[in-house]
Design a protein with these regions (language model features):
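Core sequence-specific DNA-binding domains of diverse transcription factors
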Residues: 1-197
Length: 197
């Protein structure tokens, strides 16, 4: 099985396209080291039913009561022909394990659970994260980061430039789950997640 990878750089974020792949075969050597000699032929596989897309994994902030579980939205998105982001509803195969979710506990008492991926595999591009209730009078927040590197989910192609400073699209997404508030933090005047590009 052969694979090829498109390098992610400052020119990578483009609309969907049909790949044009030419395979140049110079010679063939089998497992017994027998070779055909020089062939010099080019094969062009039919890629008319393929569509290459630029994607990312988006995870959103959420808040609510410390007495109930929270479901943090997490979805696979693609950069479409309109140059906007949309949920990749055709994705029903992307897998992520619970252990691929790294979290930082900033609750007033230790969080006795772990974030869990809801859909395994993705359901129409949606994975979501379940966070169980921390319990009465336990407030604060948990930062959740899906680890997309090969030491985690091994989904490098779903990283993105979340900080607006990475031309290689090599950053994991992060979101905050805040427990113990119902309508937002009264101390904060306004909060918004920044989406670069």
């Amino acid at each position: 099985k052969d694979t090829f990878v498109y390098t992610r750089n400052e020119n990578s974020q483009i609309t969907p396209f049909k790949p044009a792949i030419d395979l140049v075969i110079v010679s063939i050597t089998d497992s017994d080291k027998v070779t055909t000699g020089v062939i010099n032929t080019t094969l062009t596989p039919d890629a008319s039913n393929m569509n290459m897309v630029f994607g990312r994994l988006l995870i959103n902030n959420i808040h609510g009561s410390e007495l109930t579980a929270l479901v943090m939205p997490m979805q696979i998105e693609i950069f479409n022909d309109s140059k906007t982001w949309e949920i990749h509803t055709a994705d029903t195969t992307t897998q992520m394990a619970d252990d691929d979710l790294k979290f930082i506990d900033k609750l007033s008492s230790a969080y006795n659970s772990k974030p869990e991926v809801v859909n395994k595999p993705a359901l129409s591009g949606v994975l979501n994260v379940n966070l169980s209730s921390p319990g009465p009078d336990i407030d604060g927040y948990i930062d959740v980061t899906p680890e997309l590197s090969d030491t985690g989910a091994n989904l490098e192609w779903l990283k993105f430039d979340w900080s607006g400073t990475s031309s290689t699209f090599d950053e994991n997404p992060t979101a905050k789950a805040t427990f113990g508030i119902y309508k937002g933090n009264p101390v904060q005047i306004y909060i918004q997640q920044a989406f670069p590009k």
